[in-house]
A protein has these predicted regions:
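Catalytic helix-loop patch of NAD(P)-dependent Rossmann-fold dehydrogenases
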Residues: 1-44, 56, 60
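Gly/Ser/Thr-rich beta-alpha loop segments that engage phosphate groups in nucleotides
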Residues: 3, 23, 54, 90-92, ...
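Short secondary-structure boundary/capping segments
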Residues: 10-11, 69-70, 110
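Active-site beta-alpha turn of Rossmann-fold NAD(P)-dependent dehydrogenases/reductases
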Residues: 17, 46-48, 122
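Conserved sequence/active-site signature of Rossmann-fold short-chain dehydrogenase/reductase
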Residues: 50-52, 102
Length: 203
């Protein structure tokens, strides 16, 4: 949803903004009918902005860190949107979560078959796109941060802020923590540099 009611797993926060979001919400509501009586474990995870290894196939839908890394490689600079809707240049925020942490959350539920329901899978802390860009530029040790006009086609349709309410996940017992974003950016950039972002068994 837009986030005007927060980003918890409660119905009051579930306002699909497009057909893709509606399809996911439709399936969540379908699954909710079976949580209480299902013989097998049923868990739905709502992933926030995931980034990390092996997302090359996603093209334009790959994470911003992946795109920024490749922008720098091609042009020696990173591009972000100018400010809009009360946000400064590059100050739009997202709850970015490292894919390694997503894996930890998945294994947490694997280890706790008694748990069921729909859970947010985010860090609970939003970071700006500027934070990402500066992390990528810091990795390379040089480069320019350029702000480009906010696209007219996105006005009124763009989420300028997301931040998972992780209280339900933490209350369920997840205590695996989340990787510091600056540390994760540096680690991911190093992997992109070395293996084009792929995890390769070098034994």
């Amino acid at each position: 949803g837009s986030g005007k009611h927060g980003f918890s797993e409660k119905p009051a926060c579930e306002e699909a903004l497009n057909v893709y979001a509606f399809s996911k919400l439709f399936f969540d509501n379908y699954a909710r009918r079976y949580f209480d009586n299902a013989e097998s474990q049923l868990v739905g995870l709502r992933y926030f902005n995931v980034y990390g290894p092996q997302e090359n196939h996603k093209g334009k839908m790959a994470s911003m860190i992946f795109q920024m890394f490749n922008q720098w490689k091609a042009e020696g600079k990173v591009k972000l949107f100018e400010g809009f809707d009360g946000y400064g240049n590059g100050e739009q925020t997202r709850d970015f979560i490292y894919v390694k942490d997503v894996v930890k959350v998945n294994f947490f539920f694997w280890d706790h078959p008694e748990l069921k329901g729909i859970y947010n899978c985010g860090t609970g802390h939003a970071h700006t796109f500027n934070t990402l860009a500066k992390g990528v530029l810091k990795y390379f040790g040089s480069g320019e941060l350029e702000y480009v006009p906010f696209p007219e086609v996105l006005k009124g349709k763009y989420q300028s802020f997301t931040e998972a309410d992780s209280s339900k996940l933490l209350t369920a017992g997840y205590d695996g923590g989340f990787t510091d974003i600056e540390e994760a950016i540096a680690e991911y950039c190093a992997l992109l540099d070395k293996n084009d972002g792929y995890l390769i068994n070098e034994r």
